[in-house]
């Protein structure tokens, strides 16, 4: 088995233990090519979280260690030089959580990975297609992600992969996102961002993780480019139909046009969520045909929206 493994699988560091990071750890451990004798898997944990964890984090840490995952003390808000030293022992770094990081953190992290000579890097780029959205999309909120891509494309020492998965399925159903809201009287409200004809791609975290593991462990997997995956690709109109059917509820439909969302964002320019909604209402770089994705061509069966609702939202 070990002869099939690319060199990048020898020592893997995962950054982030939230929904995606935890799923990636499980995805790596459960991959058919994973061999504990040939690959070590580590998780970066803040020193304070390691020494004084909350009850929830303490339980999580015990579970991770029981699975053979090494817990490594380190803070991604440390200096670039400190991060470079931290990353040097690893052949792969997989970053799985960066929405709340201060500006400049993603670039610093990428520079540290490159300076450390890490063989393989999956940056925090999970989501939409930043190349298509461009630097101006969402009032420039994704310009740092584009800078990260420019940095990676300008070098050839570290192989990299960007996983374009659309919006996380769980995020699509979060109350704060505002797209799906259960109402009294066996009703559910679905709000389209811009119009009912706008299209979105969505993938659940567990499937993003499965695809990540598949990319890491297979020597013939694509590198140095974005890889597109999809659990579902559908219009908001189709999405509303699916929600109503899966929940067996009457759907109350409303749309927030792009102009309205831009006005709301301009009133509160520091609110990232409102800027995200503008990006989704602008309609660029948000979707791709499911049948044309790498995951479909690889024969990976990913969970669609209807099945996700029946398992997680009923």
Where are these regions (language model features)?
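Short beta-strand elements of ligand-binding domains
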Residues: 119-125
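NAD(P)H-binding glycine-rich loop region in Rossmannoid oxidoreductase-like domains
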Residues: 50-116, 131-133
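Conserved residues at the C-terminal ends of beta-strands
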Residues: 96, 124, 166
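Oxidoreductase cofactor-interface core, primarily capturing Rossmann-like NAD(P)-dependent enzymes
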Residues: 2-46, 50-59, 128-250, 261-265
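A hydrophobic C-terminal alpha-helical subdomain
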Residues: 257-314
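Structural motif
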Residues: 11, 91-92, 120
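Short, amphipathic alpha-helical "lid/cap" segments that border enzyme active or binding sites
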Residues: 84, 205-213, 302-310
């Amino acid at each position: 088995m070990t002869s099939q493994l690319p060199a990048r699988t020898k020592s893997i560091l995962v950054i982030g233990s939230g929904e995606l990071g935890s799923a990636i750890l499980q995805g790596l451990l459960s991959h058919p090519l994973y061999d504990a004798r040939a690959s070590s898997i580590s998780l970066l944990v803040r020193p304070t979280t390691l020494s004084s964890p909350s009850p929830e984090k303490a339980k999580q840490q015990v579970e991770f260690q029981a699975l053979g995952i090494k817990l490594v003390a380190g803070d991604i808000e440390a200096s670039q030089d400190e991060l470079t030293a931290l990353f040097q022992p690893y052949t792969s770094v997989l970053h799985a959580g960066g929405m709340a990081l201060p500006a400049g953190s993603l670039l610093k992290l990428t520079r540290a990975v490159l300076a450390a000579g890490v063989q393989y890097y999956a940056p925090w780029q999970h989501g939409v297609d930043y190349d298509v959205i461009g630097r101006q999309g969402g009032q420039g909120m994704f310009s740092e992600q584009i800078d990260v891509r420019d940095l990676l494309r300008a070098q050839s020492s570290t192989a990299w992969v960007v996983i374009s998965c659309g919006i996380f399925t769980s995020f699509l159903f979060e109350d704060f996102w505002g797209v799906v809201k259960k109402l009294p009287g066996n009703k559910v409200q679905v709000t389209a961002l811009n119009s009912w004809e706008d299209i979105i791609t969505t993938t659940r975290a567990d499937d993003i993780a499965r695809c990540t593991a598949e990319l890491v462990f297979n020597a013939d997997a694509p590198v140095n480019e974005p890889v597109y995956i999809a659990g579902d690709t559908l219009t908001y109109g189709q999405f509303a139909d699916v929600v109503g059917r899966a929940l067996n509820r009457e759907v109350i439909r409303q749309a927030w046009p792009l102009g309205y969302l831009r006005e709301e964002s301009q009133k509160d320019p520091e609110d990232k969520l409102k800027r995200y909604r503008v990006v989704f209402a602008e309609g660029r770089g948000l979707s791709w045909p499911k049948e044309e994705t790498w995951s479909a061509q690889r024969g990976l069966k990913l969970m669609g929206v209807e099945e996700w609702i029946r398992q997680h939202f009923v």
